[in-house]
Amino acid sequence: MRGAASASVREPTPLPGRGAPRTKPRAGRGPTVGTPATLALPARGRPRSRNGLASKGQRGAAPTGPGHRALPSRDTALPQERNKKLEAVGTGIEPKAMSQGLVTFGDVAVDFSQEEWEWLNPIQRNLYRKVMLENYRNLASLGLCVSKPDVISSLEQGKEPWTVKRKMTRAWCPDLKAVWKIKELPLKKDFCEGKLSQAVITERLTSYNLEYSLLGEHWDYDALFETQPGLVTIKNLAVDFRQQLHPAQKNFCKNGIWENNSDLGSAGHCVAKPDLVSLLEQEKEPWMVKRELTGSLFSGQRSVHETQELFPKQDSYAEGVTDRTSNTKLDCSSFRENWDSDYVFGRKLAVGQETQFRQEPITHNKTLSKERERTYNKSGRWFYLDDSEEKVHNRDSIKNFQKSSVVIKQTGIYAGKKLFKCNECKKTFTQSSSLTVHQRIHTGEKPYKCNECGKAFSDGSSFARHQRCHTGKKPYECIECGKAFIQNTSLIRHWRYYHTGEKPFDCIDCGKAFSDHIGLNQHRRIHTGEKPYKCDVCHKSFRYGSSLTVHQRIHTGEKPYECDVCRKAFSHHASLTQHQRVHSGEKPFKCKECGKAFRQNIHLASHLRIHTGEKPFECAECGKSFSISSQLATHQRIHTGEKPYECKVCSKAFTQKAHLAQHQKTHTGEKPYECKECGKAFSQTTHLIQHQRVHTGEKPYKCMECGKAFGDNSSCTQHQRLHTGQRPYECIECGKAFKTKSSLICHRRSHTGEKPYECSVCGKAFSHRQSLSVHQRIHSGKKPYECKECRKTFIQIGHLNQHKRVHTGERSYNYKKSRKVFRQTAHLAHHQRIHTGESSTCPSLPSTSNPVDLFPKFLWNPSSLPSP
């Protein structure tokens, strides 16, 4: 096969380190016209043109003429002869070219290898992108592009163009004649392992042309297609191995098969991507390729395939079952676009083994019987022909190997079955390597460790992506907004979410759509209830790994996100973003009902329940409902008695974190909230708001019984207990009940004798803060309460109220026995002692014969006292 076609290979002048240019102008193609910007490639490499660009007739000189910009090469010391072989990136499309023949995208496209692309500087890369995209748009506007080429899709997505793998788009013709040139490879030390020698593996890889992909370098597509009746398929080039190879050997094979398939795809003579190539693209093992014969593949050509009977023979080096398939000779025109991509040819040759297979046709589409399938599953071996039918395979005998012969690895289990099962969770995998990586989840093994931060990973790909965090490398850039990403998947998600709005992944339970499968998988855990991420400290489980990471910072105390304004730190980036709105004043979430704006969306959602009256969170103990789940959680602590927030100074505990923060200000004396009217400061915003109503006169809380209004809700609630008689706070010592909790606290100090509030001037102590405040006015001389009738001032509002009765003549305190009426309770109390016989003297009064007559007068008119 190779010998027959070798005569058509021309011997071009090769570039150093690579093969020669592999294309020349096709007959009938019109000349191309240069665009205003043409790229000069670096001297180290060259682009690989498809159809006529920089062909033999154009390689004499670099592009010249007006509008051509030759970018500087990195290696200016290279010989001038090499610089002459630089090729232009794109060519413009003129109407006159249409008369000489249709122009395709392949006529104006240039490919780069990875090595060549890395030698381009950023200016050259940007120019390449612009020219290629402009050429495609010009062709599309003329209707010359039926579908978007992969290289354009990659450029639009910000990918590097050398990553493009061409999909097979045309007929796969099985009767092609392979033409390649054998190129010797340098021997590498310790290249082989086991029983494979250096000489054997190097000779085999060389004969199959796997290092430099010589088919792509030395093949003249146009000349071949015009002169040869048959075409080359990937099955003529692909090599399968049934013995475990060294990683270096695997790279040799993978790169070669990959590039050969890419070359055939660029020629446009393939119908679908082979399974072998798909597996290599997915970083899977090529021996996992499975073949399953299906029904009729082509209309008009029914009996085009013949399967081969298997002849068993034990082999000590590998396991599995071999099958082989042959094709009848067909022209390209006999194939259609509905080629079954699952039926892909491959060749399974054991390196160093001398094996050949005999051909014995059976009925088309005949599948393996269940009995034979069980036999294959049970034995799990490779079956070969008799020794008498084996042939020695050297470089010449490989050429004699029938081009239609294919040896396929079958395991007795059809495609779609998963072969490797995890013993821990029973999850199955199609590759042993995938199972190995998965098992590290159970063992906790993380063999890949970052030298920068010490973080470890269970697989190499995650480790490679992580390292970009330290290097800052973001190779994937969005062509719309210019945003760059560390991972290609992040770019795709960004592209769908912000630019295209595409959501191709639908939830089968609720129909919700997502832009990537990761979001869908996370969403489905809501339906399944799965929480696979568990905290090692408190054993709390989470649906998402990110939620676990944030939760673990509660235990570690880590707060990596710091505000640039106030230096406050947060454990979550979202919390920092919300906090920064406090400084900026931004409130992006607005209520459509009342126009009130909020900093967080969750606050808006809670606010909307005020309008709807919805209270979906109900306490199971008392049946009380709440509009916010956090309110329910706080309320439930009343029933459980839990007080998780404790003050480190006085050890006082609270049910809410906000209450602890308010309490801590009593120790620090901090009062950050100041009234702009009078300058009075407060430790809480709620106290400031209540105080400001004193100036505005606003009293939004109204009693439904008597209509009395109050400036704060707590005062209104306490007032309503006058009507209901409710006294919910009872002293456990004496059983006395009170309307307010603060009254109970003050009362309990009468039993304990505690007086925590001490005057800093005279040292006098009080059991209540208000008593201390009133006492301090004695030292300061402040009398804030003034009578509007006589302008007399008083220290306490109670004294003012008593004084007002002098003007009104009101006597509110009546003694039932004597029916005597008094203006003040003190007068009434003293009068009662007359009837009880209890002695009472005032230490500040002078000694008189009738202190009873003097004392009431002294209380309301101290000036009437005689001088001592």
From Swiss-Prot:
It holds the Pfam family zf-C2H2. Keywords: DNA-binding, Metal-binding, Nucleus, Repeat, Transcription, Transcription regulation, Zinc, Zinc-finger. It is found in: Nucleus. Residues 1-82 are annotated as: Disordered. GO terms for cellular component: nucleus. A zinc finger (C2H2-type) spans 420-442, 448-470, 476-499, 505-527, 533-555, 561-583, 589-611, 617-639, 645-667, 673-695, 701-723, 729-751, 757-779, 785-807, 813-835. SUPFAM superfamilies: beta-beta-alpha zinc fingers, KRAB domain (Kruppel-associated box). Residues 103-174, 232-299 form the KRAB domain. GO terms for molecular function: DNA-binding transcription factor activity, RNA polymerase II-specific; RNA polymerase II cis-regulatory region sequence-specific DNA binding; zinc ion binding. GO terms for biological process: regulation of transcription by RNA polymerase II. CDD domains: KRAB_A-box (cd07765). May be involved in transcriptional regulation. May have a role in embryonic development. Belongs to the krueppel C2H2-type zinc-finger protein family. This is Zinc finger protein 28 homolog. It comes from Homo sapiens. The gene is ZFP28.
